[in-house]
């Protein structure tokens, strides 16, 4: 067993694992009583080694039960070893904590917790709840430190393969700062954990026979022999003076000074003692309150007498204030009367002192005017007095109401004080009485409440720990997932390199075979054997590699059912197909993280589809497999929404069932020729041929002008493979034939198709003059190859992933995309075509050269960048010019045909001499 060969102790009483681990993390501590109030973080100077006695549940039969074991942690391997005693040289067994999770149950026995590994569940029990929590937290921390100390992630070979590693590491660092929010660190129980715990008395140690591990009997015997030898060697050392302790004990006492054991968790007292204590406290409280109630009553009486005196004094002050105001008013009135008398005296003196009558008359007039003015002032003051009197009456009424309200409040207050006095007397009497049956019920309820509080605290602690464990396991899972992702990316890169090397190897074998020819018999035979072995590698390795890693081999079919490696009868073609499949797989692996993943993310964030420049660029780059059906339905709806009607497709199917169409026979013949390299159309139990038949028959009734034309079966089949619905595939076919392609493209004369071939020749002369000159010198007609490209939009020509990428852009932009990709295909293979000098070799190469294209990104860049400028106006002009010339040629051909028929009709049927007639031939037996 790994880890069992630990270095033995020099003496039987020493502990072999007592060395402190270098760089061990410092553990912050806090007492359990502080958990609810908040966590303080005092740092411990030297954390003790994680070791101590725990009880392990195990055994079989009658000896099954708790067994005391000495546990110690190995930081190098992240293993928790255990032995029967601390003095044993060899551990009994170990627990791998790197992939373990921890659990504690609130309803289990106090101090019990579990360690769950993928292989087994170990149940352990600590002496106290505090020791259990300390062990769990330390094991969590050690597990995380081990995962954090693993070697760094492998460096990616390409920047595109780096992924989101830095972001995930930053997220993990941020989570480390928050991990302590679940469960506060527990104070170290120095008497139960650490090297010093080896000399502490073990709590409730089982009997010696029951404590022996029969499962590890050999290890038990070895440990016993080691202990016996150690005791013999150290027998003299045990009689040294008391002051001469061993260095290990001195070091242990210096490093870990065990604090005096704190008070343990209070046990649950019996019911009688709890009731008596509660009764005593309640009676003591009642007596103290009864001593205060009489003083409170006397105070209330004194307060009432003082309030009445204050009220009488206030009323007396109010009366004296009113009397003072009246005296002041009287003084003012007398003062005014005195002033009026003095003024009258002065006026009379002035009147008598006047010498002439004129002066006296003037004085009289002046007084008359003053009297009139005073009369007006008196009237104004009278009006003001009346308004003030009204205001005063209103205020007096309000004052009376307020006084009534105050009196009401005083009455209420007095009534409440009386009620308080009565209740106080009643409470005092109740407290003075002995506890009765109701009090005993109350005490029992109080006891139950205390038990429930204990249970609630236990469940709260369990919940905090489980949250902490979930957080820790999640962090470890994310770290492992990050490493796994980096390893998968590296594996994909190496697989791509392997595919490239294998394709180069096969290409080299093919070139050697071509160079040797049939001259060297032994070498040719050796090359043939090597090629056969290379072609059989895929089948032999597929079963073995698929178990290890799914993308390690090339699957037989792609996601749409097309063969990835076509089965050719000719050995050279099979070799080329294998090389092509390896190159496609290599490009797919290299582009998965660098190109496809960002593209998938952009499509995932794209909301509702709407025509835009961004959507145009995304469609040119290709639609991911999971988004393609939705995008195609939206593109088709844009094209045929003016033609769609509810129930139209079903009506066409019903019409086809009622009446047989003339094109039904040709459709039936073409069904078996549709995509022979696709499993959906070659499997006898597949439903795709029946769906395709119904779609083509419905279209023949939808468009009677065209009916059915060879090539429509491939267009409808592509739509069925992507959309997987008959009606959607039908409207896709309608969109292509009636809205995207020009008129007469699928007519009997294929007029528009022939026009596009001539337009393509002009564009090739403009964009690729060197290639066209090379082909022109060898009299190669490209229309034999390109005519079918345009008729079926490259179906059966390009490999499936490139074909569907072309269709993504074709359904949005139209026929212009077909011209771009046709030019790009010749540009992609221009150098290979220029190396061929014989016209027969060129024709042979043109028949399969589209299958050699494996880099879809390069082909797309050529089509939409290297072929620019590509104005639609130029395309329309070329089409118009060639259509006019082609129509003239067709008219001339029709005239020649009519003249020929007239000539034949004028000559009549001519029968060669000596040849028997049909009647004679039929008459012969």
Swiss-Prot record:
GO BP terms: positive regulation of GTPase activity
Protein name in UniProt: TBC1 domain family member 2A
Modified residues (Phosphoserine): 917
Domain (PH): residue spans on this chain: 47-144
Regions crossing the membrane: none
Main subcellular location of this protein, as a coarse class: cytoplasm
Region (Disordered), start-end ranges: 1-41, 231-278, 904-925
Stretches the record annotates as Interaction with RAC1: 297-435
Function: May act as a GTPase-activating protein for Rab family protein(s). Signal effector acting as a linker between RAC1 and RAB7A, leading to RAB7A inactivation and further inhibition of cadherin degradation.
GO CC terms, sorted: anchoring junction; cell junction; cytoplasm; cytoplasmic vesicle; plasma membrane
Encoding gene per record: TBC1D2
Oligomeric and partner information: Interacts with activated RAC1 and CDH1.
Subcellular localization(s) per the UniProt record: Cytoplasm; Cytoplasmic vesicle; Cell junction
Residue list for modification N-acetylmethionine: 1
The keyword Coiled coil appears for this protein: yes
InterPro entries given in the database record: PH-like_dom_sf (IPR011993), PH_domain (IPR001849), Rab-GAP-TBC_dom (IPR000195), Rab-GAP_TBC_sf (IPR035969), Rab_GAP_TBC_domain (IPR050302)
């Amino acid at each position: 067993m790994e880890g069992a060969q630990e270095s033995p102790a020099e003496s039987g009483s020493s502990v072999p694992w007592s060395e402190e681990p270098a760089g061990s993390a410092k553990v912050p501590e806090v007492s359990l009583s502080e958990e609810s109030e908040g966590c303080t973080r005092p740092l411990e100077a030297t954390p003790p080694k994680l070791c101590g006695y725990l009880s392990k549940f195990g055994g079989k039969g009658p000896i099954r039960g708790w067994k005391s074991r000495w546990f110690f942690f190995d930081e190098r391997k992240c293993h928790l070893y255990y032995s029967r005693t601390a003095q044993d040289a060899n551990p009994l067994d170990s627990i791998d904590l790197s992939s373990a999770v921890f659990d504690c149950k609130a309803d289990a026995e106090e101090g019990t917790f579990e360690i769950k590994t993928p292989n087994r569940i170990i149940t352990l029990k600590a002496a106290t709840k505090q020791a259990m929590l300390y062990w769990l937290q330390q094991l969590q921390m050690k597990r995380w430190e081990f995962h954090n100390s693993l070697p760094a992630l492998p460096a990616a070979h390409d920047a595109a393969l780096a992924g989101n590693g830095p972001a995930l590491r930053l997220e993990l660092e941020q989570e480390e700062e928050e991990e302590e929010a679940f469960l506060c660190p527990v104070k170290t129980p120095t008497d139960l954990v650490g090297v010093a715990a080896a000399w502490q008395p073990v709590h409730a140690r089982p009997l010696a026979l029951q404590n022996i591990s029969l499962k590890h009997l050999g290890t038990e015997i070895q440990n016993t022999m080691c202990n016996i030898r150690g005791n013999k060697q150290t027998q003299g050392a045990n009689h040294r003076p008391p002051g001469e302790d061993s260095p290990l004990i001195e070091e242990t006492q210096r490093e870990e000074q065990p604090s005096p054991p704190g008070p343990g968790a209070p046990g649950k007292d019996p019911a009688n003692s709890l009731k008596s204590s509660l009764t005593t406290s309640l009676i003591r409280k009642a007596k103290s309150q009864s001593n205060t109630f009489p003083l409170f009553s006397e105070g209330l009486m004194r307060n009432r007498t003082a309030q009445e005196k204050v009220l009488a004094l206030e009323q007396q002050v109010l009366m004296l204030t009113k009397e003072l105001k009246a005296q002041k008013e009287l003084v003012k009135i007398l003062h005014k009367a005195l002033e009026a008398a003095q003024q009258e005296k002065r006026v009379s003196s002035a009147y008598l002192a006047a010498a002439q009558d004129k002066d006296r008359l003037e004085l009289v007039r002046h007084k008359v005017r003053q009297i009139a003015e005073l009369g007006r002032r008196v009237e104004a003051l009278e009006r003001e007095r009346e308004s003030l009197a009204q205001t005063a009456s209103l205020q007096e009424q309000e004052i009376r109401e307020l006084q009534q309200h105050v009196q009401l409040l005083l009455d209420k207050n007095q009534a409440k004080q009386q009620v308080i006095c009565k209740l106080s007397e009643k409470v005092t009497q109740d407290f003075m009485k002995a506890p009765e049956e109701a009090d005993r019920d109350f005490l029992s309820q109080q006891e139950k409440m205390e038990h429930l509080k204990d249970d609630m605290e236990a469940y709260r602690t369990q919940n905090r720990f489980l949250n902490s464990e979930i957080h820790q396991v999640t962090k470890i899972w994310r770290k492992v997932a990050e490493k796994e992702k980096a390893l998968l990316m590296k594996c994909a890169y190496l697989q791509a390199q392997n595919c490239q090397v294998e394709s180069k190897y096969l290409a080299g074998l093919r070139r050697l075979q071509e160079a040797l020819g049939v001259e060297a018999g032994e070498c040719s035979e050796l090359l043939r054997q090597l090629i056969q072995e290379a072609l059989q590698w895929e089948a032999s390795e597929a079963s073995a590699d698929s178990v290890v890693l799914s993308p390690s081999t090339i699957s037989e079919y792609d996601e749409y059912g097309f063969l990835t490696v076509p089965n050719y009868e000719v050995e050279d073609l099979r070799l080329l197909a294998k090389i092509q499949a390896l190159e496609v797989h290599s490009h797919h692996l290299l582009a998965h993280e660098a190109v496809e993943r960002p593209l998938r993310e952009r499509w995932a964030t794209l909301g509702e589809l709407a025509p835009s420049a961004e959507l145009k660029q995304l469609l040119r780059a290709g639609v991911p497999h999971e988004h393609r059906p939705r995008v195609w339905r939206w593109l088709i709806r844009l094209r045929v929404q003016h033609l769609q009607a509810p129930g139209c497709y079903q009506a066409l199917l019903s019409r086809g069932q009622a009446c047989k169409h003339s094109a039904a026979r040709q459709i039936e013949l073409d069904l078996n020729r549709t995509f022979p390299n696709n499993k959906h159309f070659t499997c006898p139990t597949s439903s795709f041929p029946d769906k395709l038949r119904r779609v083509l028959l419905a279209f023949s009734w939808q468009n009677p002008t065209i009916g059915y034309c060879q090539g429509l079966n491939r267009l409808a089949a592509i739509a069925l493979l992507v959309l997987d619905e008959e009606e959607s595939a039908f409207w896709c076919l309608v969109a292509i034939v009636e809205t995207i392609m020009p008129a007469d493209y699928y007519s009997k004369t294929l007029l528009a198709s022939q026009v596009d071939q001539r337009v393509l020749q002009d564009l090739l002369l403009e964009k690729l003059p060197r290639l066209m000159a090379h082909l022109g010198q060898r009299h190669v007609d490209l229309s034999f190859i390109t005519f079918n490209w345009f008729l079926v939009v490259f179906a059966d020509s390009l490999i499936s992933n490139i074909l569907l990428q072309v269709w993504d852009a074709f359904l949005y932009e139209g026929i212009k995309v077909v011209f771009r990709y046709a030019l790009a295909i010749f540009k992609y293979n221009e150098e290979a075509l220029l190396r061929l000098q014989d016209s027969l070799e060129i024709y042979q190469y043109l028949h399969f050269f589209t299958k050699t294209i494996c880099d879809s990104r390069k082909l797309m860049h050529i089509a939409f960048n290297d072929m620019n400028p590509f104005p639609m106006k130029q395309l329309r002009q070329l089409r118009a010019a060639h259509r006019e010339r082609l129509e003239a040629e067709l008219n001339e051909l029709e005239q020649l045909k009519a003249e020929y028929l007239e000539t034949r009709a004028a000559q009549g049927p001519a029968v060669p001499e000596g040849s028997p007639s049909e009647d004679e031939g039929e008459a012969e037996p």
